[in-house]
Every structure is written in C-alpha cells, then in structure tokens.
Amino acid sequence: MQISKKFGQGKTVFSLEVFPPKKDSPVESIYRVLGELTKLKPDFISVTYGAGGNAADHTTCDIASYIQTNYGIDALTHLTCVNSTKEDMDTTLEYLKNQGVMNILALRGDKNPEIEPKKDFTYASSLVEYIKTKGDFHLSGACYPEIHIEASSIEEDLEHLKYKVDCGAEHLISQLFFDNDYFFDFLEKARKKGITVPIEAGIMPVVNKRQIERMVTMCGASIPSKLAKILQRYEHQEEALRDAGIAYAVEQIMHLVASGVDGIHLYTMNNAYIATKIHEAIFRLL
C-alpha cells in the first residue's frame, strides 16, 4: 500500500525503522529482530542503508521484501544516491519492482570521505525527480526540525524541502529530535510554506550516551537540559539509562500524539525490547 495513503484515517500512524546487520554479521540477526518487532503491528517498517551505501547493494531491498512477504507489513526502503550512478539506480529500481517493494525513502546519503561521490545525483530532490520518471513508485523524504546541518538558514532548508515535495515526495519523516518545541515550530513553518504532505515525527530512544552523542554530531540535534541531566546521572548505569531513555521517549510521544501529529516513526536501533516497551506505553493513544 502507498505509505502516504495510511495517513488521514482517523489514527496516528506508527512506524518503525531498522537497519541491515553489519557486513561481518549474519543476515539472520535482523530476521530475529523483525520477528519481535512485527508483533507490534506497525503501519510500516523502514529499512536503512549502511553508511556509504550505494544502489548496487541489494541488502536493504531484500530485507524490505522479506518484511512484506513474511509478515504482510508494508516496507519503506531507504535509497541513497550520493555514491550511485543512474545505471546503478536503474538496476536497483528494477530489482525493487520485481520484489514488489514500491515505497522508497529517497535520500542523498552521508558523504564518505574515503569515496569520491558520483556526479549523477547531488541532492535527494534530484533522486525523487529521477525516480518519478521510472514508474509507479511512491516516494517519501526526510526533513529536519532543527534544519539540515549543511543549510545556512531555516528559510533555505524549507525552500529545498518544498522543492523536494514538488518533485514528488508524498510523505516526510523527520530527523530525530529531543525537544518537541523544535518539531512544532518546524511543522508550523513548513505548513506556512505550503508543504501539505504528512510529516511523521522521528523519535530515537536514548539508551546509550556515546551512541546518542555520535548521532547528535551527525545530524545536528540539540540535547535539552532535562535529557542532559539524565545522561549525566545514569551514564554508567546501563539498565537505568535504558529505562530513563524509554520514559523520556514515551513522554515525547504522548505529547506529540496529544497535539495531533500525523505519525510517530520510531528509530528502533534494532532493539526489539525497547521498541516493545515504548509501544506498550503508547499504543492505546494512537
């Protein structure tokens, strides 16, 4: 089913994100995680690319196909373009179509300093525009409540986002954030800009201080004082930090849902226990 069609049905969409196992890990490890996550009956599951991935790597596509075939849950496959040629992309799009995976989250992808980027696609919008010429794919895009780290201003970032939507992105998923006010402010500005597609709030539970610090550095999200105190207090208490992180994410989600957000996209980090605990606390509100 087209992801964007899941919105506006009188409920808050709830979706999950997983990532493929590392190259030195068996692919079966993600299948075990999916066996638990699918019990939560999410509206869809997105599958990421690894850092520096290119369209010629079909691991993400295979996992997305596995989700749909074995669990009957729609999958949203991430597709990055910074390290891909149009020929790579054509091969992958044909592969996806043959697998019945028609929902794509179109991304530029992170630049790898060790790999010279290809020249065919410069921005996610150019990928969206290209895929729209290739058949009946349904396209989603990313958005940034605290603006993209390469954007000079919120105005510039919204201009790029509006162009991406105009090119064919039908649904947006936000980058992680830890202060809901940033999301609400961004949402208001996006709507005033004429961006009317559904916008999901991306939530990442804080369960590992080093991991969160790395993610914050990569995406530019800020850590509010309340969360900083949690990280400081429980830094060396693994289970306590996990439980506090779950509680913080639940509080965020409850506020977002009560405020009428289109959807919640949970970055699971392949941790079924944490995703399940959060779902248990919020599923009646959706």
Identify the role of each PLM range.
Residues M1-L16, K23, A228, F283-L286:
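N-terminal amphipathic alpha-helix/helix-capping segment at the start of soluble metabolic enzymes
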Residues I3-K5, V27-E36, G52-I73:
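Glycine-rich, positively charged N-terminal anion/phosphate-binding segment
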Residues V13-S29, A75-E87, S140-E156, R233-A247:
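Active-site mouth loops of central-metabolism enzymes
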Residues E17, I45, L96, K164, ...:
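Conserved, mostly hydrophobic/aromatic
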Residues V18-P21, T48-G52, H78-S84, G109-K111, ...:
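Active-site beta-loop-alpha junctions enriched in small/polar residues
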Residues P21, P42-I63, G109-K119, E170-F183, ...:
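Glycine-rich, proline-tolerant flexible connector loops at the mouths of alpha/beta enzymes
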Residues S29, C81-Y95, K118-T122:
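Glycine-rich anion/phosphate-binding loops
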Residues K119-Y144, G194-I246, E251, I282-L286:
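Active-site pocket-lining/capping segments in soluble small-molecule metabolic enzymes
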